[in-house]
């Protein structure tokens, strides 16, 4: 066996090993097209170590994060300026006819006149049946007998006062009205012998019976109208006809 072929193969093997890191398969084929055949690539190796940090990059665009929950309402702001007037609204419906003041005044006057007429009729009925009218006074009795204090209370209840004649005409009207002796609104309870009306005013008209007032029994502080129209002082605790006068 010749040594030359073996030596040739050994030399080629050494050359292939020396250039295995830098010579590609294509280069090898160019150098030794007839001898060296390329194998298939091997499997990938393990990842290498991390390299050094690179230089700082440029600032990126703002990101879009997740939208948060709605916060609580803020404080009320100051009132705004008044707004401009709005446009006129639609025309309303036609209203009911109004009442004329002249008609109301005329109606009130008519009603007042009718009421006055009715009151005049009532006064005439009362005058005819129970009382007497003299001037602007109306004298009225209920026909009951009672003490002087009760007569005062009865008359006051009807906003009247105990009958007090101020002249002969009024005294005569009361005399014609009563069928029994009646109390008059005259006393000397405050000062003995000084008879005054129930408002404390001195009398300007009197019609005492002969010998009166005499204060018989020392307690005759009230005045009685006798059937003959004369006056007599009597005790206020006695009971006599109630007689009131009403201003009209």
Swiss-Prot record:
Calcium-dependent lectin involved in innate immune defense. Binds mannose, fucose and N-acetylglucosamine on different microorganisms and activates the lectin complement pathway. Binds to late apoptotic cells, as well as to apoptotic blebs and to necrotic cells, but not to early apoptotic cells, facilitating their uptake by macrophages. This is Mannose-binding protein C. Residues 43-111 are annotated as: Disordered. Keywords: Calcium, Coiled coil, Collagen, Complement activation lectin pathway, Complement pathway, Disulfide bond, Hydroxylation, Immunity, Innate immunity, Lectin, Mannose-binding, Repeat, Secreted, Signal. One of its GO terms (molecular function) is D-mannose binding. Its main location: secreted. Residues 42-99 form the Collagen-like domain. The lineage of its organism: Eukaryota, Metazoa, Chordata, Craniata, Vertebrata. Residues 134-245 form the C-type lectin domain. The gene is MBL2. The coiled-coil domain mediates trimerization. The modification 4-hydroxyproline is found at residues 47, 73, 79, 82, 88.
């Amino acid at each position: 066996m010749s040594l030359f072929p073996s030596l040739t193969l050994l030399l080629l093997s050494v050359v292939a090993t020396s250039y295995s890191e830098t010579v590609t398969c294509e280069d090898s084929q160019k150098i030794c097209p007839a001898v060296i055949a390329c194998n298939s690539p091997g499997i990938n190796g393990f990842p290498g170590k991390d390299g050094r940090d690179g230089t700082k990059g440029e600032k990126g665009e703002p990101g879009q994060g997740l939208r948060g929950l709605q916060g609580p309402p803020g404080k009320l702001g100051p009132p705004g300026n008044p707004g401009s007037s709005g446009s006129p609204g639609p025309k309303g419906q036609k209203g009911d006819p109004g009442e004329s003041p002249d008609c109301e005044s005329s109606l009130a006057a008519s009603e007042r006149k009718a009421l006055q007429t009715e009151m005049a009729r009532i006064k005439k009925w009362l005058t005819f049946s129970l009382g007497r009218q003299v001037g602007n006074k109306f004298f009225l009795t209920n026909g009951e007998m009672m003490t002087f204090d009760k007569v005062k209370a009865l008359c006051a209840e009807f906003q009247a006062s105990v009958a007090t004649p101020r002249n002969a005409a009024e005294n005569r009207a009361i005399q014609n009205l009563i069928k029994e002796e009646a109390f008059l609104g005259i006393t000397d309870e405050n000062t003995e012998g000084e008879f005054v009306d129930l408002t404390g005013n001195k009398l300007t008209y009197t019609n005492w019976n002969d010998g009166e007032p005499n204060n018989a029994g020392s307690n005759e502080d009230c005045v009685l109208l006798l059937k003959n129209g004369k006056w007599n002082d009597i005790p206020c605790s006695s009971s006599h006809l109630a007689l009131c006068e009403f201003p009209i």
